Amino acid sequence: MSMSDPIGDMLTRIRNAGRAKHDTCLVPGSKIKKSILDLMKEEGFIRDYESVKVNETFEDYKVFLKYDQTKRPIIRELIRVSTPGRRVYIKSTEIRPYKNNIGTLIVSTSKGIMTGKNARKLKLGGEVILKMS
């Protein structure tokens, strides 16, 4: 059976692993998922991730989750905004701080995938992929 929303599946795997207090979770690989994981690491929502070869053509990503001192996941909220059935686009002038700059928007622009803060700085709009805090 084919997957209709691979990014949504990745977010669900990360969300469920965090709630179950797992240290890592395995996510099927793709270029867009790698870009999203890079931004999650840069923003401090995950510790790290590494590429795991499944075979010569496929790779997965092993995501190392991050927790606070009380063993609560750093990622409190991970919401898929734009889905294959309902695309959500935003202009650069409409990008606002999410949750008083505690959260992050991830936007797919013509210059690549970036945070909402960077997209606003570069005056680029695009498709809102997800929001997290």
UniProtKB/Swiss-Prot annotation:
Protein origin, superkingdom: Bacteria
Key words of the record: Ribonucleoprotein, Ribosomal protein, RNA-binding, rRNA-binding
BP-aspect Gene Ontology terms: translation
Gene3D superfamilies on file: 3.30.1370.30, 3.30.1490.10
Keyword Plastid among UniProt keywords: no
Gene Ontology annotations for the cellular component aspect, listed alphabetically: ribonucleoprotein complex; ribosome
GO molecular function, one term: rRNA binding
HAMAP family linked to this entry: Ribosomal_uS8_B
Assembly: Part of the 30S ribosomal subunit. Contacts proteins S5 and S12.
Family, as annotated: Belongs to the universal ribosomal protein uS8 family.
Chain's role: One of the primary rRNA binding proteins, it binds directly to 16S rRNA central domain where it helps coordinate assembly of the platform of the 30S subunit.
Protein's name according to its UniProt entry: Small ribosomal subunit protein uS8
Species the sequence originates in: Leptospira borgpetersenii serovar Hardjo-bovis (strain JB197)
